[in-house]
Amino acid sequence: MKETSEDNPDPEDKSTDDTDSILKVITRRKWGAQASRTPKKQRLKHPVNFVRFLDTTTDADSYEDCSEYMKEVQKFRMFTGDTDIPYNFVVGSDSLVYEGVGWKVEVDRPLKLRYLLGDCLDIAFIGDLEDGFMPSSEMFKAAIDVIKYGIEKNYISPTYLQLPLDGWRPSYFLKPHR
């Protein structure tokens, strides 16, 4: 995975140090993340068997707006008691991939989704489905690149199950076809 910024701020998480990949990620340092409060035990077990897709229910149209969104959602979630941003990765309206908590950390989950603990990667699209948002083909491609990279590096099982939002059917678009 090719970084678009300096080293990852978490010295134990080398999730963005693979320079031989086509996947480009805006690292936590690049978008201005605060230090995570996630306990070291809150880790994903690889390869994960589930990938969940979400919308952020917000809009951001540029790199600057997307970076600002990442900072604001992290700040709000940490203020309300979560340990960090609630996504592993976020695909911006600018079609760039932003590192949330990355490949190795479990996001904070609501009680009804506790069955996914340790076994699910969350990828969010910046946008609001209730306002008629549909990810662009470039955003879908960025999400597919995340999945392909995850499978290649054994972060995601090649037989993973995709968990789409209610009423949203991205399955055809997001399963990497070989």
Residue ranges and their predicted role:
Residues 8-62, 116-135, 151:
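Cell-envelope and extracellular/periplasmic
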Residues 25-106:
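Short, conserved "active-site rim" segments that organize catalytic pockets and cofactor/ligand binding
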Residues 56, 92, 157-178:
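Acidic/histidine-rich, metal-coordinating catalytic segments
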